[in-house]
Structure formats: C-alpha cells, structure tokens
Amino acid sequence: MVVIIQGKNVVDISFFPEDALQLHELAKQHSVTAIVDCGVAPGMSNWVLGYYNTIMKIDQFECMVGGLPKLRIKPWEYKAPFSPIDVLEEYTRPARYVENGHIITKPALSDVELIDFEYAGTLESFNTDGLRSLLFTMPDILNMKEKTLRYPGHIKLIQSLIKAGFLNHEPMQVQGQQVSPMQFTSKILFEQWKLGEAEPEFTIMKIIMKGMMHDKQVCVEYFLYDEYDEATKTSSMSRTTGYTCTAAVNLLLKNFFNEKGIFPPELVAPTPGCFEFVMDYLAKRNVHYRKTVS
C-alpha cells in the first residue's frame, strides 16, 4: 500500500492472503499501475489463461505445477526453493477451485492423482489454493483447478505430519515454553529441505484449456520443463518466476501497458502485444513453453 501511496508503479510476485484487487481504486487515485501475482504460478498460468480467454470459449482450465530436486533423497524427496514454512502453509491452506461455475473448497492435499510427465516421470498431483485472482476475474470459465506436483509418496508423509499435529499453529506448552508446532516443524525441516546453491533441480508446469475455438472443440496445452542453468548459476524456479516478473516490468517501462489500477496477469494479457512480449522475453532467456493444440 505504501508503494501505491508514493505513486510508484510495481510488479509483485510475493504471496499474501489479502485480496490485492481491493486496492484497485486506491491505485487509480494515485495513477499507479500494479501487476500482482506475477511469478510462474500464479503468474504465467494467468498470462496464458487471460490471453486464450479472448480467442476461445474456455470451459475447463487446469494448471499443474511443481519445483523439485533432480536427486531424490528419502524420506522427503523434496527441496524447497523458498521458505519451508511457506510450503507447509500451502499444504494446510484449504484449496478453492471452480466446479460448474461455483467456488468449491476442499482440504489441501486432496484428490491425489499419479500422472506421467515427459522428462520428470511419474509425479503425484494434489489440490492446492493456487487459483487466487482467477476465482474472481474469470467468472465465465465454469471449471478451474490448480494442483501442485511432487514425487510419489511425499504427500503421505505430509498427511502424517498433519494428523499428528505437527502443522498446527496453536502454541503448546513444552517445558514451560509456548511452542508453535508449525514453527517447530519448519525449523526442523529447514536444513533437510534447503536447496543447495548449485543443486540440480527443475520446474515443471502443464496448463490445460478445453473449449471452443473457431467453432471447433479444442484442447490447448502449454508445457514447461526448465532446469538449473549452469551457465548463469540460477535455479529454474528463480528463472521461471523472476523472468516472468521482469518481463512485466519491461512492459511498464516500455509503456506497452499503462492502465491504472491493480492488475493480475490475466487482466493484462488481453492487451494487444503484451502476451507475445512476455513469451518472447522468456524465450530469449531460454525459458520455453511448448504449445500443443488438439
């Protein structure tokens, strides 16, 4: 909010539980353009959906995404590309999705499926609360869901932690001290889940949109597989998230998008040239999304 009041344009990738769209009028009053949730997912998934929502009638949208280490070390077979407590929060936050035009809430980690992916092999997908602004900006799309990807077996371990109370927020008394199980668990897992500076890892995402285009039923898919870049010493999560953000920054600097207010990517994507600019910007940095239409 301070940035808006100061009259500064901004592109943001951070998670916060509040609804950024509530600041839309304030941003307009201060002649500010703010693009929010502009990472990989939410972020690129929103760019893709926002663009295709202008050229096809979408009935169904699904995004599956995950960041994983290439080396699978038991028991977790996981490394966190960001703070472990943020990952644990994602594992406990109720997941909202859209079914037949209605917002439905399910427990996080529900609807586990095993899915085969090119390059990554078999991964398990499960519900997480990643649709965010899409729940409210895309009312014409009747079915939408977002799922996170992990190696098979990881979620059973997390579910055991949840059942045992290790991810509870309510402090409990331990030897005269108030201790939050969630904070304690995050501290324990910090070193185990810490991604090494040059550790091989990858980011994978599959976006599926089904609907009508040119009077034909079509399925449009975008597939991302990106690995640690040895030449630049940057992780795939840094690249796929950070370059999406800097692409949007360049949109503002070049005045390709200058509307005032709060805009998640799906509301910027329909502006002529913006989606193409972002895709080209990423491709020039070797972040490639493969499109297929069937």
Give residue ranges: language-model regions:
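Alpha-helix C-terminal capping segments
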Residues: V2-Q6, N250-L253
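Short Asp/Glu-rich motifs
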Residues: Q22-L23, N46, R72
